């Protein structure tokens, strides 16, 4: 299958960043099957779980995960893992990981830094969520410290950006829930990431991972968005958006310019490190594509790790500095769930 990046002219000054694929019957090409879960490395699992429970009513059960493959997967000899797999509305899963046994270096990104990540929680009552967050002394990133009015695909909405105890970004947006939405304040979830380059991000996710992302090539200066993320006036941005298969979760990548940026990359074990885990149909083929493109492989010796239960996996770094766990499953269910 031939894949190429194009910028399609839509107007004199506006284009579309997308990928064109030639017709092919090759269904065996390595590609994403599903987003398994978003990942967030934490400094203390109990503290972070308490935050999400007290602020948003989201619950998770902490447990030790004594899998001997973890040190190889994360290239951290001697490390041990305690985790909680939180099940969120819309079949989304959010894995909180607490690594022990080795030194860790916490890190916090600016929202405009490539590699920064945010979980977006859509709520029925944003004022209640903000009040709960203030009780925990959660840092508020949004300029002015209060929700701002933004425009979403569903119309006008109130939104605010804050940090959890590890500095991970949490965007809270109030919107009317769809019919049949789960009970509780949080009724929907999406993911948001900051990218260094829209073109490089499209080459990685569209061209190799097989995730369909697209967006305008032109930059915008929407004041409400800049206020939401705490960016200075004059900052410009553009987005790539798509839907992650599996939970059918909306995902967006934002590139900023006109503001100082520093690529944010932490080791898998470092508190504040974001990641995502994606299931693919052909891990060996996918890894060959990634290595041929010069992708940094994190796992020990750059090799696929047998995780047990028919699961084989590896960690790589995307062009923006974020860690991506890519895995193939041929046997039983992943024991982390």
Segments from the language model and where they lie:
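Vicinal oxygen chelate
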Residues: 21-30, 33-44, 63, 81-100, 105-133, 157-163, ...
């Amino acid at each position: 299958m031939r894949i190429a990046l194009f910028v399609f002219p839509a107007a004199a000054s506006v284009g579309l960043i997308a990928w064109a694929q030639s017709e092919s019957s090759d269904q065996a090409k390595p590609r994403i099957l599903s987003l398994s879960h978003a990942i967030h490395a934490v400094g203390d699992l109990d503290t972070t779980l308490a935050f999400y429970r007290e602020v948003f009513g989201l619950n998770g059960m902490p447990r030790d995960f004594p899998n001997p493959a973890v040190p190889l997967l994360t290239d951290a000899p001697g490390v041990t893992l305690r985790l909680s797999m939180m099940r969120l509305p819309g079949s989304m899963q959010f894995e909180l990981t607490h690594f022990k046994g080795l030194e860790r270096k916490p890190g916090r990104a600016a929202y405009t830094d490539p590699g920064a990540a945010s979980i977006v929680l859509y709520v029925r009552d944003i004022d209640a969520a903000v009040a709960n967050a203030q009780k925990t002394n959660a840092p508020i990133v949004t300029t002015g410290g209060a929700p701002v009015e933004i425009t979403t695909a569903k119309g006008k909405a109130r939104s605010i950006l804050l940090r959890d105890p590890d500095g991970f970004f949490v965007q809270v947006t109030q919107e009317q829930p769809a019919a049949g939405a789960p009970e509780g304040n949080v009724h929907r979830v999406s993911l948001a990431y900051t990218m260094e380059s829209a073109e490089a991000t499209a080459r990685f996710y569209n061209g190799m991972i097989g995730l369909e992302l697209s967006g305008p090539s032109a930059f915008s200066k929407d004041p409400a968005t800049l206020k939401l993320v705490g960016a200075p006036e004059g900052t410009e941005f553009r987005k790539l958006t798509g839907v992650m298969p599996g939970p059918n979760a909306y995902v967006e990548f934002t590139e900023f310019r006109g503001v100082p940026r520093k690529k944010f990359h932490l080791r898998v074990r470092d508190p504040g490190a974001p990641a995502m885990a994606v299931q693919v149909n052909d891990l060996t083929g996918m890894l060959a594509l990634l290595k041929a493109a010069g992708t940094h492989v994190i796992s020990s010796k750059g090799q696929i790790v047998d995780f047990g239960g028919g699961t084989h996996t590896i960690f790589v770094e995307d062009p923006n500095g974020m860690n991506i766990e890519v895995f193939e499953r041929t046997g039983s269910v992943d024991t982390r769930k």
